[in-house]
């Protein structure tokens, strides 16, 4: 592990371990608050659960907002049958292909409970069934119990959130970190490191680092957060889809893992209600100039079928000039999301330089 990225990788590993499905981000928030101790002058928590960490600048009229969402995609228990098996529904966008034969953790009032995602053995599935992934409606959790009463004695109840049971790790000690919640704990780690780097600096702008909630279920937290801050400029920090793997053409996903953070120019998700963000040219030009001036490797990104906190922030109040710094990621919205710590370190460099040089509205 490179010395430059060792601390960032360890921070990401700790963040990834914490459970924080959309709507249940409290443990992540407490961890973030602890990691940012000494890095902010003011703190606020709003009714939704967004956490605001403000480092005050010398110009009270200048405000810059950073956002990274704390929540991860997961599941929620919606039924326990008479035999004690639990059924669940997704919280956020999931790929049913990833769910078979997994260990999941149910986060009950009594504590975490493990269950196995069960289904028919391969020996008895039909040819038609063997050709497709079972839909989530046919997948259940096996707790090793004999009936509903025993399952409920474990603490499992309708409404309990569920996550993958999998520790994050640096893959083979190499260049990729893989975990269940790199979307967007990778962005949270970057935001924490930026605030740490800025800790002793006298800045003209106030910096509002906001750990947001419920991004994965409709980008619900960032809009109210930006409404509170009323920033001159905002930057979302989030993962993006990386190509470079078998079956994906470069023209589909040209951003590559390990080639630096991506400066987003445009994103659009028509399937999610036509949401997206056309980043103002004056902002992308400034980010590109800073990356080149500081010799920070970067990529240019246009993304279809995806969006970030940037969409909601851009539409807040009278409108906010909003960009996104993207962290290339493989296998997003699965238990094995991957990012490259070097890309994260580059994002820290780029965002820190942008903040330090931000002295007037764009």
Where are these regions (language model features)?
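N-terminal hydrophobic/helix-forming segments and targeting peptides
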Residues: 1-362
């Amino acid at each position: 592990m490179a010395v430059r990225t060792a601390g960032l990788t360890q921070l990401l590993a700790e963040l990834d371990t914490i459970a924080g499905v959309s709507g249940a981000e409290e443990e992540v928030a407490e961890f973030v608050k602890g990691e940012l101790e000494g890095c902010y002058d003011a703190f606020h928590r709003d009714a939704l659960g967004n956490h605001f960490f403000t480092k005050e600048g010398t110009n009270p009229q200048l405000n810059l907002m950073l956002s990274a969402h704390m929540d991860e995609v997961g599941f929620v228990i919606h039924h326990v049958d008479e035999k004690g098996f639990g059924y669940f529904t997704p919280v956020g966008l999931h790929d049913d292909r990833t769910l078979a034969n997994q260990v999941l953790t149910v986060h009950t009032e009594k504590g975490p409970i493990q269950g196995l995602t069960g289904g028919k053995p391969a020996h008895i599935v039909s040819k038609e069934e063997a050709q497709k992934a079972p839909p989530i409606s046919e997948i259940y959790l096996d707790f090793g119990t004999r009936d509903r009463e025993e399952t409920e004695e474990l603490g499992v109840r309708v409404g309990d959130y569920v996550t993958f049971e999998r520790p994050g790790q640096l893959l083979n000690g190499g260049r990729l970190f893989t975990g269940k919640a790199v979307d967007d704990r990778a962005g949270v780690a970057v935001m924490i490191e930026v605030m740490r780097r800025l800790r002793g600096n006298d800045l003209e702008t106030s910096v509002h680092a906001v750990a947001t909630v419920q991004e994965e279920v409709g980008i619900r937290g960032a809009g109210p957060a930006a409404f509170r801050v009323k920033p001159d400029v905002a930057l979302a920090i989030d993962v993006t889809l990386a190509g470079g793997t078998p079956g994906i053409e470069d023209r589909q996903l040209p951003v590559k893992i390990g080639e630096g953070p991506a400066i987003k120019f445009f994103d659009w998700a028509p399937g999610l209600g036509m949401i997206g963000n056309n980043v103002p040219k004056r902002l992308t030009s400034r980010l590109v100039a800073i990356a080149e001036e500081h010799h920070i490797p970067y990529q240019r990104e246009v993304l279809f079928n995806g969006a970030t906190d940037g969409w909601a922030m851009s539409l807040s109040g009278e409108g906010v000039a909003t960009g996104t710094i993207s962290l290339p990621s493989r296998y997003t919205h699965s238990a094995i999301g991957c990012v490259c710590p070097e890309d994260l370190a580059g994002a820290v460099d780029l965002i820190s330089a942008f903040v330090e040089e931000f002295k007037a509205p764009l």
